[in-house]
Amino acid sequence: MKMDAFRFGTTDWSAVEPTGHKGETGMATWRTCFFGDEANPIRVRMVEYSPGYLADHWCKKGHVLLCLEGELETTLDDGRKFVLTPGMSYQVGDNAEAHQSYTRTGAKLFVVD
């Protein structure tokens, strides 16, 4: 990730239009902004997972993810599981380790990729 093509700015996340994304179970609501070079933008999201959300895919994209509320369980394709609670984050590179998200309680996340 290279962050050199945009100026200082602020984001009022409540003013960003939400989009819904169905999981295998539950729903994800994203508020998404893009910054930087149009050819390789940085995507920044505020994501909310409903209780019982399970992603409908194994993700191979890299992220920096911070848990703001709730609890997020991430399973890697080798079977390892990690639980994030508020104030915890994870980092993974593109194509490094496929991962799938689940939350029993619901979760609010800040994600950069």
Indicate where each model-derived feature is located:
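A short, N-terminal "cap"/entry segment at the start of jelly-roll beta-barrel domains
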Residues: 1-43
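Conserved short histidine dyad/triad with adjacent acidic residue
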Residues: 40-59, 93-96
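Conserved hydrophobic/aromatic positions in well-ordered beta-strands
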Residues: 45-47, 65, 110
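Short, conserved beta-strand element in jelly-roll/cupin
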Residues: 49, 58-74
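Short beta-strand His + acidic residue motifs that chelate non-heme Fe in jelly-roll/DSBH
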Residues: 56-57, 74-75, 92-93, 97-104
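Short acidic-glycine-tyrosine-enriched beta hairpin
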Residues: 78-95
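A short hydrophobic beta-strand segment most commonly corresponding to one strand
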Residues: 89-92, 104-113
